[in-house]
Regions:
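Pocket-forming structural segment of enzyme catalytic cores
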Residues: 12-13, 35-111
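Flexible gly/pro-rich beta->alpha loop and the following alpha-helix that scaffold active-site loops
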Residues: 1-24, 30-42
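Histidine-centered divalent metal-coordination motifs
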Residues: 27, 93, 128
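Hydrophobic/aromatic beta-strand patches that form the interior of the parallel beta-sheet core
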Residues: 24, 46, 90, 123-125
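Active-site acidic short loop of glycosyltransferases
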Residues: 21, 85, 119
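C-terminal and late-domain segments of enzyme folds
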Residues: 96-146
Length: 146
């Protein structure tokens, strides 16, 4: 909620939503692009009409936050151009976006969820491409080339 309050105070919320060039939100940036987040019960930017949920461990071995390497599957976005198999990327998060019409890649941790979103000129990743080695570099290069 603090981040959204800052964006509103600086009048950046409307500016971000009006951008026409490609925009990439990473981790919290992806969550802020959604409609609402259970983290702080915050209303967000609403670019993606979907809510952010908190992971609820279902088994003893399920740890929250989800930290570490995991795979991207069902990739279908320009961010993943050149991907021909499941790729590993790095995650650190306690909240997730359920699968929805904007899902650009899927990851499974506790349950399947959206690890990337895409709508118009807005792209978002729950994982950290900047911490994901050569795969992350390829994703960032693909974004720069949009």
């Amino acid at each position: 909620e603090t981040t959204m309050n800052y964006l509103r105070e600086q009048q950046l919320d409307a500016l971000i939503k009006d951008l026409k060039q490609p925009v990439l939100g990473i981790c919290l940036g992806m969550q802020l692009m959604c409609r609402h987040s259970e983290e702080g019960n915050a209303d967000c930017l609403g670019i993606f009409d979907i809510d952010v949920k908190k992971f609820e461990p279902m088994r003893h071995e399920d740890k929250v936050p989800h930290m570490g390497w995991n795979t991207l599957t069902d990739t279908h976005s320009a961010l993943f151009k050149g991907f021909d198999k499941e790729e590993f990327v790095y995650f650190v998060h306690s909240f997730y976006v359920p699968l929805n019409e904007f899902t650009a890649s899927t990851t499974h941790y506790i349950l399947p969820y959206s690890s990337a979103l895409h709508k118009d000129n807005f792209y978002a990743t729950q994982f950290h491409p900047e911490k994901s080695g050569a795969v992350g570099e390829r994703i960032l290069r693909n974004f720069i080339e949009l």
